């Protein structure tokens, strides 16, 4: 007894027939029949509910129907199970095709029917149950028309509504940020402030007052002061005395705001004392006034470029 006869004699015969629909009647084989070579038939049992639905269909290729002159139209259960005849000539289901299911897992099976996708998605074209559909002609025409309109709009210099919306959002953000930062008042930065150049050397100190363009207004050195001539100009307080003298002269000239630039290969403590001495000479040691708006150290910094000269032997 082969596998087909075992399927036919099983208790789930009706479920097997319903699962492989399109059969009007079933021939029950005897135990001496193989089901394929044409054994003896005992009775034909029609399937309930199937005769009325399939009365208009032809009996070609069904088991138990009258044979046709063309024997190639007859198919076995193996062919039906493999789904070889699941599509007709004009794209319709064949009489012996397996039934369709609206389950989402049906598209993964090898016997998915071509009309399954059309049943689950009636608005989309049929692609044979593969789950993918080619774009229709109307959607392609709409896409080409929209792209042509965008090109014409860009060529004519027009601006789309999307760009206008983005521009409005940017303008609103600019107004908000401007409103936030308007509460913070910027200090009055002096653009044409005079500059005080303090150059501190080992044996002398040079202090020069210039305008914003570099024109010299006044200058002084440690040796120019009457009290610091000779060896006294090499003392520690010579830079402070020179800066204080220039502070008094700058006050007499009517300067209001200055920028101090210090230069010298020494620690910043001496530079700080010179800057404070200039402020005291300008304000007559009054702490409520300060003409200095900016301080900058312009000392050159070596980046191991040139070799230093040989140190002097003592």
UniProtKB/Swiss-Prot annotation:
Instruction: Give residue spans, biased composition: Polar residues.
Output: 50-63
- Region annotation Disordered: residue ranges? 34-138
* Keyword presence, tRNA processing: no
Cellular component GO terms held in the UniProt record = mitochondrion; ribonucleoprotein complex; ribosome
Indicate the family of this protein. Belongs to the universal ribosomal protein uS11 family.
Its function, per the record, reads: Required for karyogamy during female gametophyte development, when the two polar nuclei fuse to form the diploid central cell nucleus.
Protein name according to UniProt:
Small ribosomal subunit protein uS11m
